Amino acid sequence: MSHSVLSSVTLGYEPIWDRWRKLCGVRLLVDTDTPDTVDARHLLAALSELWPGSSHPLLLSVRPAALLHGLLAQPPRPGIWLEIPDPQLSDALFAGRVRKARQQGLPMVWRGVPGQAPSNAAQAWLHKALRSLTPQEALQALRVSLRQHQASAMGTASGPLHSPVAAGSLYEGLASPALVEHALDRQSAWGVVGWPTEEVLHAYRFKQIQPARHLVLALVQAIDADESLETIEHRMGDEPLLTYRFLRYANSAGLGLLRDIDSVRQGLMAIGYTRLRTWLMEQLPHASSDPNLDPIRATQVLRARIMERLADAGVEDGLRREVFLCGIFSQVDLLLGEPLGAAILHLPLPGRVASAILGQTGPYAPWLEVAAALESGSTRVIREVCKAHQMPPGEVNRALLRTLAASAL
């Protein structure tokens, strides 16, 4: 039954990031064209089967009101939260179901319109609040942030400052790194839904982004611990920019290898741990410690891991590694600061990878387009892309949930 119910819904996702810029939860978008035919109990059972209850929360943002009503009537499931839109609380029947769900221990997250705070009545049952700022509130938050930074630089107290950002809440739609830093670092917000990727990268328009220092160090430590080739390969894949530079290094004339290296596995086997460690140590002095880049890297890796899962049933290990490279390099231009075509052509990648990234053609293109659609925030787009590529919704949903669950552990 869990397999059939996952075939009847469309799922999308938005990562939730904490003050350390690590994944602390996932907002799962749930939609269906036929809400009356989706059994809420079976849907929760299917999600629970694929989501480890001891990991980060899975926040269900359910579009059809009928399905949301049905989910409110179900017993709580470990690790699963339910988003409650404030406008629906005006319905007395719905509000009554919310109160009853609270009595049963269901964690619920109130969500309002920009600038809105939960009412006293909502405060009685909400587990968290998902808020957003109006333009005026965003400006006020930036002013407060500026005064806080000025006071810190001068070693003085900033005085009484009122920020519109509430401690312990989730926030969505924060459009700049300054707002994110104010919310997470200064005001102790619980988490941020989504990430201001374009604005973070804009700060690097005149300087080169470097691989993450903590991920380079983790690779060095893995080598020192004599971890397996598979583990080293997986860790390398957690850093898209480092993976790209490693393949450039493995194919450099100075290294003198006798053949093209078109995969991380080939490169690791050809170079060996000793030379790899030396090369990694050369990266460390220039490595980045900017935590605001971490969600950007992690999102790119999530796309690649989802593609791996989508391909899992149909390809052998070597081809699955190609699929991963296709995903991880599909946005590498954002980190390199150069056109995607030029970046891809610098590497001797298999034609299937290059054609999917640059031409949206070939056998890997459907997986890439579906993985990109899943992060779009639009269930309509997801449904249309899956239909265009004749990819069964149940298969896509299971790949998504398994990838998110593995990332949340």
Regions found by a protein language model. Give the residues of each.
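Bacterial c-di-GMP phosphodiesterase EAL domain
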Residues: 2-81, 86-96, 272, 295, ...
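The catalytic core of metal-dependent phosphodiesterases that act on cyclic dinucleotides
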Residues: 74-198, 319-322
